[in-house]
Amino acid sequence: YADSLGLMMWQDMVSGFATSRKKEEHVNPLATTDWNAPEEHTRQWQKEMFEMIDRLRFYPCITTWVVFNEGWGQHNTVEIVNKVIKYDDTRLINGVTGWTDRGVGDMYDVHNYPVTSMILPENNGNRISVLGEFGGYGWAIKEHIWNPNMRNWGYKNIDGAMALIDSYGRLVYDLETLIAQGLSAAVYTQTTDVEGEVNGLITYDRKVTKIPEGLLHLMHNRLYEITPAKAVTLIADGQNGSKNTRLVSLNGQEL
């Protein structure tokens, strides 16, 4: 469906455990070392990650593989991210989204709630600077939430449509300065409400769009009019560079 819309996607690998039974499994944002994962764990986790890539790699809408998220089960970062880079050199690799960057992969990715503040690194090589999560303004519309009897939250609670429009508009405006400094992407939390979280732009039942689409379009269009920092080609395509590509069927036969 994303392919039919022309929607570009980032595909995350899931975290390596259901819950953090041991605190060292969740790497602290300021930690200088990764989790020393058992060999059996990292072997199984990598097996499932490469199976995911093999299963989904034929969908051109996927532009980026995301390996680790916010320190959850983060282990052997440099080794694993470099493996993914070699395994699929046709896509961008976001080695660590949020928190514990190890200087590997195509992106430097920071999470910040609810504001857009971000210190862009001065010496980042050719890595892309990304605000991988921000915002999270929560407006609970009671008739349209998953379970009204539980806590429904956002990173900052908002009361009503006008307050949300004003707050969201300020966030988008604040991105303009970062783009001029070299910010390449920003991911708002989030598209829809989910179980227990009401920070979506659309309600859980998909019946209410909290900010009118036309207004969102006007807000976002300003971001594309800003002159960014100098662009750098990281992966050549058929029109730019010398990347050779082949079209093959699912059984590996060239078309």
Regions found by a protein language model. Name each.
Residues 104-112, 128-129:
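Active-site regions of enzymes building and remodeling cell-envelope glycoconjugates
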Residues 13, 97, 111, 133, ...:
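Residues at the C-termini of beta-strands that transition into short coil/loop
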Residues 112-120:
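A polyampholytic, Gly/Pro-enriched intrinsically disordered region
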